Amino acid sequence: MRILVSNDDGYFAPGIAALAAALGELGDVTVVAPERDRSGASNSLTLDRPLSLRRAANGFFFVNGTPTDCVHLAVTGMLDQLPDMVVSGVNHGANMGDDTLYSGTVAAATEGYLLGIPSIAVSLASWSATDFSVAAQVARDVAARLMRSPLPAPVLLNVNVPDCAGGAPKGTRVTRLGKRHKAEPVIRSQTPRGETVYWVGAAGAAADAGEGTDFHAVANGFVSVTPLQVDLTHTGQIAAVDTWLSA
């Protein structure tokens, strides 16, 4: 089995090292990841300059681009054979609800999905955790199950693992995406030279975190697995918009 691994935290991140080691138990792993932290890059492709591909001392490849660039470059220009699976992560911090629209971790998996490859995004729901071994083993188990018993194509799974402080999650829940409140306002600051600058504010708190959501599962100690798709069509409004335009 050939597995392509990427992330948005960068090729040097501990989460991707743990993930690559765990997935190495299943087959041949190739790591292609950004040269620096590209969190929040979403599905952006670099179109205004060429990309470079280099190899680090640990054997991982890194690209001066986005997570989407990494997967696109690897699949369409680097690898001699298509990977059987793309796995992105382990992200340092959750990617639940609206996070999935901004997440570079989810975007790397989405690019694999768009290229016809079963893909998984994996995140550890903690900003302070330093041990990614449990999340990496969860990723390995999900990938192994998908390998043994494939789901109907196309496949894009978003996996969030609770921080269990060295213990094990209570189990796994198949969930839908929850929803956050709108983000906090930008933070205004000044440079030492007096220039006004802005920092993007924190993500909003969970607004829809009821039973069945990814937020609820993780908050209660369960791994959340959410099947995703890319079709953004608001099917329920097609008739209403048609009537509106015809009036």
Curated annotation (Swiss-Prot):
InterPro entries: SurE (IPR030048), SurE-like_Pase/nucleotidase (IPR002828), SurE-like_sf (IPR036523). The keyword Nucleotide-binding applies. Its cofactor is a divalent metal cation. It is found in: Cytoplasm. Its EC number is 3.1.3.5. Gene3D superfamilies: Survival protein SurE-like phosphatase/nucleotidase. Binds 1 divalent metal cation per subunit. Keywords: Cytoplasm, Hydrolase, Metal-binding, Nucleotide-binding. A divalent metal cation binds at D8, D9, S39, N91. One of its GO terms (cellular component) is cytoplasm. GO terms for molecular function: 3'-nucleotidase activity; 5'-nucleotidase activity; exopolyphosphatase activity; metal ion binding; nucleotide binding. It catalyses: a ribonucleoside 5'-phosphate + H2O = a ribonucleoside + phosphate. Transmembrane segments: none annotated. Nucleotidase that shows phosphatase activity on nucleoside 5'-monophosphates. This is 5'-nucleotidase SurE. It comes from Azoarcus sp. (strain BH72).
